[in-house]
């Protein structure tokens, strides 16, 4: 029997975790729903969680609370201690200088909290914002706390793919900076097998790379559970399509819409979202006057669930060579609603891998985009295996169940905390998670 340590309390305090991220509830786009749900789930599992994040701004790129600035707001949300820090919100999100100011402003804003870094047993930082990662690295250098890096997107690759950075020297510099910050972390995790392989090629200290997929957040799951199961329901004529989420350069959604517009395919396409290219889509739909297209704002969860229930296909587009780290996560809500997925992407991308593995619907390369209208005509005529896609979506949804993923994350976090960041202890403790 282990003897109690001198001065040890009969009831140990909960492990204290700091999560650093740019978006948090009420922001749902850009991973906000998942980041928030992880904090809530870890609180449920006995962690004392503090979240340092920006004021709500995404994907609209506007100060949604009216509080963004130099002030720090502190409050509790479902047991998590939330701290809001100011950030420069770009008016032109695809301009490189504005993106650099966006990243740098968040880093400087967060650095004000650095003296309180000793309060935590471990830090988890989410990337795509390198500014967040830079702060977490500074915290590690000062306080020597174990650092977990969760890579949702490779920022340098995303900047290149979206046209934010076009100069090869600038792109190389961004990748070098990204690699240096990444390799200060003790353990990495990411959201798809393709991303695991990419990260293993970037690591310099043999850090564990944990495959930890995202999941359907709890509140969205409850909204979908209120609706009847639509598995087995035949597609409509016209075929109902839904796109919902961020609308930026990486999606290349306008190109997809233009291809459908030039055809006489039988479809109705609802598009709901916001982001750097949303106004472009809205204006294009208004200009064309094509009644098959309908544009609306980012949907609240109840409305999103209803739209998923109504649609035949949930559409996900991913610009060629975009990396697409985030994109497979967009499929999770569609899978959970038992909707067939219509994807347009590179076959070797994370989304392409997901579509091959789960087969929840058709996957078109951009070079085969012209085949989509004829495909929709066949669907309307009952000539495609639509019920099988629905069944596959339902089967795959179980893989993204909230409880099992957060349980795995909580167990891995306890290993990280107990290891104190020791590389050998981390590799041994997380061997079954890689």
Give the positions of each predicted feature.
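N-terminal subdomain of nucleotide-sugar transferases
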Residues: 2-78, 258-264, 430-434
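Membrane-proximal helix-turn-helix segments that form the acceptor-binding/catalytic region
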Residues: 111, 131-134, 138-142, 168-188
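Carbohydrate-associated surface elements
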Residues: 194, 212-215
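C-terminal alpha-helical cap of glycosyltransferases
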Residues: 210, 381-382, 402-434
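Conserved donor-binding/catalytic core segment of Leloir-type glycosyltransferases
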Residues: 216, 232-251, 257-261, 270
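A charged, aromatic-enriched C-terminal amphipathic alpha-helix characteristic of glycosyltransferases
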Residues: 227-228, 367-373, 384-414
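Nucleotide-activated donor-binding/catalytic signature segment of Leloir-type glycosyltransferases, i.e.
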Residues: 238, 272, 279-305
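Nucleotide-sugar-dependent
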Residues: 251, 300-307, 312-335, 341-353
